[in-house]
UniProtKB/Swiss-Prot annotation:
The keyword Transport applies. It is a multi-pass membrane protein. InterPro entries: Battenin_disease_Cln3 (IPR003492), Battenin_disease_Cln3_subgr (IPR018460), MFS_trans_sf (IPR036259). This is Protein BTN1. Keywords: Amino-acid transport, Membrane, Signal, Transmembrane, Transmembrane helix, Transport, Vacuole. It comes from Candida glabrata (strain ATCC 2001 / BCRC 20586 / JCM 3761 / NBRC 0622 / NRRL Y-65 / CBS 138). The lineage of its organism: Eukaryota, Fungi, Dikarya, Ascomycota, Saccharomycotina.
Amino acid sequence: MNSKQRVYAFFWIFGLVNNVLYVVILSAAVDIVGPKVPKTLVLLMDITPSLLIKVTAPFFIKSIPYTMRIYALIALSCIGMIFVSGKSLLLCMIGIAMASVSSGFGEVSFLQLSHFFEENALNGWSSGTGGAGIVGSSVYMLLTSIFKLPIRLSLLSFTILPFAFLLYFKLDTTQIEYDSISSSGEETLIRNSNSNALQTDTFNESIRLSKTEEQNIFVSSIDHFKSTCVNLKALVVPYMLPLSSVYLFEYLINQAVSPTLLFPLDSRGLPPFFNKYRDMYVTYGTLYQLGVFISRSLAHKFRMHNLYFLSALQGLNLVLTILQAWIYIVHTPWPIMILIFYEGLLGGSSYVNTFLNVLEEVDMDKREFSLGAVSIADSLGVFIAALVGLGLEPTICNHQVSTGRPWCRME
């Protein structure tokens, strides 16, 4: 295995492990909260901490060494999944939040890390995140719907995966540097202060920054904040807005509409593993993730520079699925399953093409920052979807019950 293949393989694993717990938790949403609670509650807990991390990360993450980040990711992921596999709903929610922090922190970190290894690393990461979807959802479906293992045991089995982050230490990280907030910022001033302290005889003077230096630190921090906001603003229209809207549409489908895309269990032509209504929800999630995996793995070979076109297509998918849930146009799940798979293809393609556009169009000196910052967009779209879904799913379900289709209230 040459160096490029090695980098691709490692980043593929990083992408898979970083996202797989997020996928497993969403796949288990119907099992965690039951049929009567909106599944977007789990989505909200699964995305809010991640979004907060991504929004605030550009202001502080540069000062945290990658080594420390790796250990934090492992701890948060493992402890979080142990909590999720517990019996208490409150403990499950805390565990989901911890796994979410790990996912958001990991995505920003590895996207920034890919800057040092160029497009090869980003391709591996993108494919790996797509692989996380199909691995997480299909393995969970296999364990619970086919092998019929207990839900809690199935969730607990995923705690071993985060230790794969240790492969980071097998990378050539000599080229990675940790810069201070700015060349004239706090770190430089502290180093100068420490150097001057060696020339003094008084302990108090050795640890105290002068007023001038403190003022310089404050001014430098303000300048850094302003420049960060300016850089973020430049990324909104070309990259963040279309990516955010794609994720808004697809997660409304996945977590708010798909739990209501149900069919009678005694219908002819149902897949043999549709033994319960929750099996339909889990299957939709697996098909979506299969589409994401395929498109994230191949999208770099079929480039799409117009990101808003992908957003429009995903919006059309949302309209079609809402119509099906509301009117019950199709009476067999197969067309819906194909549509969900296609939805995944669009979502994965949008993700990869967004970050490839950043690599191709953003200046080298701003590329590392931009890759991490644009990752805010997908989480923001998912967060909005979670809020909207809290009302959308119950509305559709109540309508179905009133028209003689009570399946959304059944297990």
